[in-house]
Amino acid sequence: MVSHQFLPYLDYIKICLASPERIRVWAQRILPNGQIVGEVTKPETINYRTLKPEMDGLFCERIFGPIKNWECHCGKYKRIKDKGIICERCGVEVTESKVRRHRMGYIELSAPVVHIWYLKGMPSYISVFLDMAAKEIEQVVYFNTYIITHSTAENKQIKYKQLLTEDEWVLIEDQIYRNEIQGEIEIGIGASAILKMLKDLDLSLESDLLRTKLVNLKAVKKDKIMKRLRIIDNFMVTGASPSWMVLNVIPVISPDLRPMVQLDGGRFATSDLNDLYRRVINRNNRLKRLEEILAPEIIIRNEKRMLQEAVDALIDNGRRGRVVVGANNRALKSLSNIIEGKQGRFRQNLLGKRVDYSGRSVIVVGPDLKLNECGIPKEMAIELFQPFLIHQIIKEGLANNMKSAKKLMQKHTSVTIELLQKIIKWHPVLLNRAPTLHRLGIQAFDPVLVDGRAIRLHPLVCPAFNADFDGDQMAVHIPLSIEAQTEARLLMLAPNNFLSPATGQPIITPSQDMVLGCYYLTNNNLANQKGSGHYFSSFEDAIIAYKQKLISLHAFIWVKFYGTINNLDIGRFIKSTLCKNKLTTTDYYENLQVKKDIEGTITCQFIKTSVGRIFFNIAISGNLFFSTSNHNK
């Protein structure tokens, strides 16, 4: 864990391979008597009689800390005044029990094992480093074939990294014994052979050789070499060694992250990780005993393979071979299962955790809202803006303390709503819809109080959130500080996010029923409509006539227009007439009638339109010029 005093000096956090020495440093502590603790050597968890953790076991208090605050294992020290003392009898440090959430242990393996992520992952890093097929390496790791790890033999049939069966190796041994093969040959099997080959790699030399090969190669082979070169360069930059992909030490995570809980009736419920760690420790201890008693090689190899499989199950259960199951044939959750996926530690508990001053509800359409507004239910707003509301109630003198202010607030009186209206007037809120795949997945809006329990959303911002109104839910967050509110208003307000950051194209565009409505209003309906051909002195007169049902929505009418007409398709010229007084002329076009005086000055003009198009023009006036043509998307 990072101490808070160092946080201001951090530039970044890097995740990389850990060396065996680093893993030991995480867990090892030196007691005043010189004893080094940290290694977990026993598979036991708790003593069934005393219900206390077993020493050197998976819940050991000496390694991970006391289970009770300020109390050691043997009970000699039980007070906070003994803080920091390490008990002479049991070796447990007198401290808070919360240290069991971050103190780690480790298991020292009797034989190296390959990390399954780097063997079975995509790409397989070990196969890329050794320039071998992943299946070939798998055969070696699980003790099915031998591999030549070093060769100076002149025989061309014997090459470095060549795979050998048991019979082939016996034949080569006979040839070496009879001096038919000159030079040294070393073979290996299991993870130890892979470890030796990775240690023998010179990364800088390999990098130089690959760069030399790239000069005169075809595209297909070049891609393969580039892939290998990129991984080698990344290891060199981070200072990681390829041999760290083979584990000699396994970290044991803190016991409070894999708890054991006592149920009613005396039974215990435990994390699956404890079972997986227990399998590793049992097999590791058994391998150690077999090596001590000089057991036959075939038995030791079988135990090493079982240890490899136990570590595989601990890291990623089911990635290779049979899934390790517990009670009721349920697959045990490994470290990978805990952190991956939607229900994993990152997405469920870190990115998706619940925070204060936030709410969640179903969204419904709010067509009467402005683009920068969203509808927040009154019940939700009172709860979310509670600190601001309590402060305002006390400031207005409606209550003397927080307790009475809370009581007044919970009554939802008209006074409370008025104060809330005043508070939210300049206080933006953040709306977020999961999954937040790009930055427009969370935007700021000015809240508007609405009845009901649903959040109202402007239909034009739906494409940015990829939202629809078939039951989608959205989260509301309240920026508390002035800095957060300012940033939300300047950078995150919906009208300020008009363009998609990915393509640069407008993302606030009308769609679906909005386009259909625009088409319906501006449609050329050729059928006989009520009131067609009537003349009106203004748009308002035409709307009044429509409301009185004197004309239909799509009837073509002539409306007097005083402004400048731009971008109007006036259609073909029909005729020009001279009035009886011979002082004015009228030019008739398909969509326009223009009256001019004797000097040619326009005195009056009528445009051909419909009430639907007038409504459409009013809706978009100030942004677009009036047009009588259909407005398709």
UniProtKB/Swiss-Prot annotation:
It is an enzyme of class 2 (transferase). Its cofactor is Mg(2+); Zn(2+). In plastids the minimal PEP RNA polymerase catalytic core is composed of four subunits: alpha, beta, beta', and beta''. When a (nuclear-encoded) sigma factor is associated with the core the holoenzyme is formed, which can initiate transcription. This is DNA-directed RNA polymerase subunit beta'. Transmembrane segments: none annotated. Mg(2+) binds at residues 468, 470, 472. Pfam families: RNA_pol_Rpb1_1 (PF04997), RNA_pol_Rpb1_2 (PF00623), RNA_pol_Rpb1_3 (PF04983). HAMAP family: RNApol_bact_RpoC1. It catalyses: RNA(n) + a ribonucleoside 5'-triphosphate = RNA(n+1) + diphosphate. The gene is rpoC1. SUPFAM superfamilies: beta and beta-prime subunits of DNA dependent RNA-polymerase. DNA-dependent RNA polymerase catalyzes the transcription of DNA into RNA using the four ribonucleoside triphosphates as substrates. Disulfide bonds: none annotated. It is found in: Plastid, Chloroplast. Belongs to the RNA polymerase beta' chain family. RpoC1 subfamily. GO terms for biological process: DNA-templated transcription. GO terms for cellular component: chloroplast; DNA-directed RNA polymerase complex; mitochondrion. It comes from Cyanidium caldarium (Red alga).
